[in-house]
UniProtKB/Swiss-Prot annotation:
<comment type="similarity">
    <text>Belongs to the glycosyl hydrolase 12 (cellulase H) family.</text>
</comment>
<feature type="glycosylation site" description="N-linked (GlcNAc...) asparagine">
    <location>
        <position position="106"/>
    </location>
</feature>
<dbReference type="GO" id="GO:0071555">
    <property type="term" value="P:cell wall organization"/>
</dbReference>
<keyword id="KW-0326">Glycosidase</keyword>
<dbReference type="InterPro" id="IPR013319">
    <property type="entry name" value="GH11/12"/>
</dbReference>
<keyword id="KW-0119">Carbohydrate metabolism</keyword>
<dbReference type="InterPro" id="IPR013320">
    <property type="entry name" value="ConA-like_dom_sf"/>
</dbReference>
<keyword id="KW-0325">Glycoprotein</keyword>
<comment type="function">
    <text>Catalyzes endohydrolysis of 1,4-beta-D-glucosidic linkages in xyloglucan with retention of the beta-configuration of the glycosyl residues. Specific for xyloglucan and does not hydrolyze other cell wall components.</text>
</comment>
<keyword id="KW-0732">Signal</keyword>
<dbReference type="GO" id="GO:0033946">
    <property type="term" value="F:xyloglucan-specific endo-beta-1,4-glucanase activity"/>
</dbReference>
<keyword id="KW-0378">Hydrolase</keyword>
<dbReference type="Pfam" id="PF01670">
    <property type="entry name" value="Glyco_hydro_12"/>
</dbReference>
<dbReference type="GO" id="GO:0008810">
    <property type="term" value="F:cellulase activity"/>
</dbReference>
<keyword id="KW-0624">Polysaccharide degradation</keyword>
<dbReference type="InterPro" id="IPR002594">
    <property type="entry name" value="GH12"/>
</dbReference>
<dbReference type="GO" id="GO:0005576">
    <property type="term" value="C:extracellular region"/>
</dbReference>
């Protein structure tokens, strides 16, 4: 059987885009501008469970992936954070013009307690320790709740056209701001820079801080036969 050059190239491209699954605690794969992590950082809190993450495809700057898990025990404790992390050069917030992103996702399974969130970190220097964590929860499923010093929101802002409850609390030496959508948002398109602009104008966040990490994924607390599907995710820092 003869193959044309175009067919051969198509097969090569298909091979390069073949799905890649990994189930180890710190498993990851690099695709385009993203590192996709399994990141079972809290698995020791579970009495039983497992999780596997799969890279499906990359088209331009849009990544498609999923993670499947079952976790029990360790009530109220996060077991993992499977996520797509953007590779970029850290920039001062004052120099960040936009963080454009799109995200379409879905969840299935039994008794799911989990969040679906952007997780972004700020530091006083490009390579320094994280000083602030900014989370944007598009979904708080099954009663999942954010870090909070009081258990109550400190504000109820509307950002990127979505109404949020804003919480504040410590995570070690970091201060964590969590924007939790009042209604689950399974399809998002907007500029994540707007969240920092809000914090600068209303919570005194310094624009001299460096944006050092932009991640997006899911934090499971408990549930079984869970399938978290990301059918469209992209983000870029400009």
């Amino acid at each position: 059987m003869k193959f044309s050059l175009s067919v051969a190239l198509s097969l090569a491209a298909a091979t390069a885009q073949a799905a890649t699954q990994f189930c180890d605690q710190w498993g990851s794969v690099t695709e385009g501008n993203y590192i996709l992590y399994n990141n079972l950082w809290g698995q020791a809190q579970a009495t039983s469970g497992s999780q596997c993450t799969t890279f499906e495809s990359l088209s331009g700057n849009t990544i498609v992936w999923n993670t499947k898990w079952s976790w029990s025990g360790g009530q109220g404790q996060v077991k993992s954070f499977a996520n797509a992390a953007l590779q970029f050069t850290p920039k001062k917030l004052s120099s960040v013009k936009s963080i454009d992103s799109t995200w379409t996702w879905n969840y299935s399974g039994s008794n799911i307690v989990a969040d679906v969130a952007y997780d972004m970190f700020l530091s006083t220097s490009p390579g320094g320790d994280h000083n602030y964590e900014i989370m944007v929860w598009l979904g708080a499923l099954g009663g999942a709740g954010p870090i909070s010093s009081t258990g109550s929101p400190i504000a109820t802002p509307t950002v990127a056209g979505i109404k949020f409850n804003l919480y504040l609390g410590p995570n070690g030496s970091m201060q964590v701001y969590s924007f939790v959508a009042q209604s689950t948002t399974k399809s998002f398109s907007g500029d994540m820079r707007d969240f920092f602009t809000y914090l600068e104008g209303n919570q005194g966040l310094s624009s001299d801080l460096y944006l050092v990490d932009v991640q997006a994924g899911t934090e499971p607390f408990s549930g079984s036969n869970a399938v978290f599907t990301v059918s469209d995710y992209s983000v870029s820092v400009a």
